[in-house]
């Protein structure tokens, strides 16, 4: 039935009504630039492009008006007029990552899931999901934020032995942060992405494990964050568990109207959960660091959502 409806007429009428180009006419004009083909534009590419720029529209709203937040590496570079990666945005239809599309997947043979690590150690455990970032904040409010560091302050390596891992070493003004991210098989047989962290500071401060509503492509919504009853794990969007290994010394959480949780650090807040209708919830677990003493921590994230969705992805 729907096949016989005059879709082209409806689309043309809607385009004329809202003063935009007729998509059917535009595609017909585009085809004239190439030799005739038996195959039109691949539907998969059109679908991917729609999703790609839909995220870009969200990025344009969320990032542009909140540049005081801590954003991923590509945003900190591409949105900075003083950086060589700067891309003017005044007439951009959408804001997408055009300059730093060089993240690394960590995985295991036989495990069809691919957590990724960006050039500054930002970990995205789930496919097209939210991320974990790691910071140092001192009592005098000096900060080591990997995404904001110059290239000279960061060294990243891909290790193949004894297991596949991405290591990221950050150094600045007496602060040092070392990260090693890999995927491992947990005791119960499922895979988890794990990050080993070592923080060293020349003064007392905090190691921060932060839940971030974005990934190297842009915004990825976080609607809820909650600490579990043991106090040693976050549950994010009710789809994955962030295991902290030990109870944090302090917790901070915020929804979009309150701004980025980063703006309130270190601070003290006993809030155990947050919900955000906008999808921009942020959370931070703080662990005390003493001057000159290395602070080690292991963080792991369960990947049950990605394993559960594998049959669905195979069908699309």
Task: Go through each PLM region and give its residues.
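Terminal accessory carbohydrate-recognition/targeting modules of carbohydrate-active enzymes
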Residues: 1-316
């Amino acid at each position: 039935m729907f096949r016989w409806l005059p879709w082209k007429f409806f689309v043309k009428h809607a385009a004329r009504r809202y003063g935009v180009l007729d998509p059917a006419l535009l595609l017909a004009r585009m085809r004239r630039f190439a030799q005739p083909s038996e195959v039109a534009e691949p539907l998969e590419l059109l679908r991917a492009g729609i999703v790609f720029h839909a995220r870009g529209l969200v990025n344009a709203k969320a990032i542009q008006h909140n540049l005081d937040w801590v954003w991923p590496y590509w945003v900190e570079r591409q949105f900075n007029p003083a950086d060589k990666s700067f891309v003017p945005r005044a007439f951009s239809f959408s804001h997408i990552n055009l300059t730093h599309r060089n993240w690394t997947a960590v995985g295991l043979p036989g495990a069809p899931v691919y957590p990724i690590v960006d050039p500054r150690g930002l970990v995205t455990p789930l496919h097209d999901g939210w991320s974990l970032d790691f910071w140092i904040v001192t009592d005098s409010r000096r900060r080591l934020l990997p995404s904001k560091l110059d290239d000279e302050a960061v060294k990243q390596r891909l290790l193949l032995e004894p297991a596949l891992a991405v290591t990221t070493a950050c150094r600045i003004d007496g602060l040092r942060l070392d990260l090693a991210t890999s995927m491992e098989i947990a005791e119960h047989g499922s895979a988890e992405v794990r990050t080993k962290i070592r923080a060293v500071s020349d003064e007392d401060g905090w190691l921060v494990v932060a839940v971030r509503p974005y990934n190297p492509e842009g915004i990825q919504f976080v609607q809820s964050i909650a600490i579990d009853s043991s106090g040693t794990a976050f549950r994010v969007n009710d789809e994955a568990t962030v295991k902290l290994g030990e109870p944090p010394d302090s917790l901070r959480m915020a929804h979009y109207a309150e701004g980025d949780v980063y703006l309130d650090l270190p601070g003290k807040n006993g809030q155990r959960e947050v919900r955000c209708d906008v999808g921009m919830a942020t959370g931070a677990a703080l662990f005390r660091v003493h001057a000159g003493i290395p602070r080690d921590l292991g963080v792991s994230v369960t990947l049950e959502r990605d394993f559960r969705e594998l049959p669905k992805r195979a069908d699309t």
